[in-house]
Structures are given as C-alpha cells and as structure tokens.
Amino acid sequence: DHFNTGVDTDTELTEIPEPGIYGGIQYKTGAGGQLALDLVYSNRQAGNEIEIRNMDFSRYALLMVNEGKIAVETTVTFRNCKFDAVTTGREDARISYVFEDCTLRNFQGSNATFTRCRLGGSSGDALNPYRNVTLRDCYIADLAHPDSGDTVHSDGVQIFGYPSLTAENISFDNCRFEVPAIPGGGSYVNACLMIAPEKSGAK
C-alpha cells in the first residue's frame, strides 16, 4: 500500500530540471519534448550494468530510444526514483529495466520489472505492458481524477497489445489495486486489469 511502496519521502531526490548530464548519464530532448535516454550513442561509456538512484524525473516524460541497436545484454536499474510517464520499446531487446521503490504516473512498454513501486496519479491507465513485464509487491491507485474531456476511462492495467506482437510474460505477485469509481457525469474507471489485445489486432 502507500506506506511501503514508491519513493522514500525522507530521501532528497535530485530533480532533472532540463536535458543535460546528471549522475554521469546524459539525457537529451526527445520526440514531443520528452526526456530521451539513449544508451547506444550518448551514453556508450556507461557500460551494461547501469544504476540510477534518487532522481526526480517527474518534470518530463522519459523515453528510452535506440534499444534495438544495443549489442550486449544491458540492465538499467532505477532505485528510489520518481517519474511522470516512462515509455520503452515494445519488442524484445537486449535491455531490461528494473524499478525498485519508485513512483510512476504511467509505464508503457516491455522488458521491465517493478518491485515495491507505486503507479498511478492521473486520469489515464497506470500501466500498459506489452511483453516481459513483472510487478512484485506493487501498489496501483490514485486514478480517480476529473478530466477536461467528456469521459474518463482509467484502468489500473490495460493490456491492449500491438500488431505483430504477442502479449506474454506479464505477471503480478502480491500487488494491490485501488480503482474507485469517479462520481458524476460520464466519467468512469473501468477495471483493475483489462485485457483487450483485439483492440490492436495483437495476440
């Protein structure tokens, strides 16, 4: 629950106010003004076991780029970090992401493991996994937010897949979902876990 997941509020986080080099890792401006993390060109010196700790990325959405060009098995571990949205590639790649004790508004992608993480905090889905995503001891909540549109359709997790991909190896172990209804109007929250690969023609 909220007492034992997410970032440690007693630990000071280093805020990422703009693209630049922080903790020896370079972040560039990506598509749509997102913060881009590139391990092929900009951070070749970082090696294949990378740890990023006590960082606050919440000012930007974080986008992982050039994953398909990574030549050796690489692991990026985020410990006690705070995020807005995080997007990784959909396909299998020689990279995996580990999130421990992190807080995220949304994750969309593949090849990631979450432990003691808290996800949610907007009127959108908290998690959109494609392949190879594991959650352990995580908390998904805080989705009942008003929206400026006509309706709000928020799922704790929505697995909608992607054409040419098979949604698989997605698992949850000891996770708590709190997905309350949004009162009034046409706003509603749909499900703790929605599985709808037919939406994109996936399997």
Regions found by a protein language model. Give the residues of each.
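Short helix-loop boundary/capping segments
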Residues: 163-165, 170, 178
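Extracellular "leader-to-stem" segments immediately downstream of a signal peptide or signal-anchor
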Residues: 1-51
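Extracellular structured ligand-interaction cores
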Residues: 111-114, 124, 132, 154, ...
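Post-signal peptide N-terminal regions of Sec-secreted extracellular proteins
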Residues: 3-10, 144-147, 166, 181
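Extracellular beta-strand/beta-solenoid scaffold signature
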Residues: 9-10, 32-42, 59-69, 80-94, ...
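All-beta strand scaffolds that present successive hydrophobic residues in beta-strands
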Residues: 21-22, 50-52, 73-78, 94-99, ...
